[in-house]
Amino acid sequence: MLPVSRRLVQHGRLIGRAVHTASSVDPSDIAHFSRLADEWWNEQGEFAALHTMNRVRVQFMREKLQEVRGWDRAVAESLGRDAPSPLNSPDFLHGCSMLDIGCGGGILAESATRLGACVTGVDASADNIRVASVHAARDPSLHVRERAEDHVPASLAYLAASAESLAGRTYDIVTAMEVVEHVNQPADFLRCLASLIKPGGHLFLSTMSRTVFSYFLTIFLAEDMLRVVTPGTHRHSQYIHPFEMVDFFRSLGWIPGERDVLAHRPLLPNGTPIAPLPPRLQYETRGTMYV
């Protein structure tokens, strides 16, 4: 087995260079998921776990955005500036531009659209985009945009493309759920994602941790024994430890920048520093990266 840090650290010499224009797409994985494309909206089928996880993800995103908004409000109030409004409305993503990389059949993309975001779903599999587009078109409550580059709140557009092909565009929120473990050159892919985020924007990631338990659960049990997931869907060698992910983003300067903020907290009118960030946000890089 490779050393635990090999998968990301082997790309460490590339840190500081411009994002590569070459695609990180793994053709074998794209072919695999293209064969499964028609299963995306079968909630008892191949992707049942993703449908269940989607509800948790949406709630997680809401909680994180609320925490960041609360911190920003405290900073603004301490400096006598207009404070941003809290995220209390049901459509808490209203007005946000969101890019969902590796959107598959559109499970998260549709949910975010209903919450008010201007969503662009991107997948390297044209078959996945076909399924996502057809499913969205069947729902009259979803506003499907003709042009992905247009900004229309509570709307949805799909593109059959790689993340690298979007160079030059930026979004308030970028998501990549269960994608990192399916790409070539994960470090270049993550740098690409970082370049697609607007200043002050947010990146949400979800991936498999490379542990014995994850192998047992996602490959031995789900693929080999129960066959609820098609064999070959996952490769344990491509899973990434959370600390590897955090170390990678630290190498980009994200976490040290956060520490600078914590070291110079603004003062309240009575002269006391505002409350420190919640411990989870200190670890996850406030308002930027969530693993």
Would you name each region that the model predicts?
Residues 207, 226-244:
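Acceptor-substrate binding/catalytic loop of class I
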